[in-house]
Amino acid sequence: MAIDIFQSLKNCVFDLQRADVQNYQQPLKQLARLLNSENLQSVNAHLTRNVELDTFLARSEDTESSMAGSAVLQWPDEPADILGLKLLLIEKMADDNNFSFNFCHTFFYDRNIIESIRKFTSSLVAPFVRDYQLYVENQHDPEPAVFRPVSRKIFIVHGHDNDALQ
């Protein structure tokens, strides 16, 4: 039986949401390991081809003022570039404990350290996994479309209508 990689990614997000300061790195490393699986390499290469993580981080850090929590991430306009940056960011955070702690403290500030990590998870990682799955399943940038809902209601009549059968 094959394991659904997207369900495994979602499980990592759930684990990260419930993690403590002492153990948040394990689900983050698991997430990065799953994202680097062999089946996703071509998609990842396509997403990261036009993005530079260090430039993005430098531009974002320039927005920080003297007030804690004032830094704002400077995302590009293209959805694929945003996904690529988030992918590189998750990989870097999984590799470097100090970077992950400082990044969450700078851009997702809260007085409680674990709350900074949970803010990062809920506002960056969870949407990334959702959008990444959509991107991979479509193999390109999905174009939003309006679909009319189709009714799945079934009308069942209970009774004894023998004449209708003949």
List PLM regions with ranges.
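Charged interaction/catalytic cores of defense and host-pathogen modules
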Residues: 1-137
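Conserved N-terminal substructure of TIR/SEFIR domains
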Residues: 128, 138-166
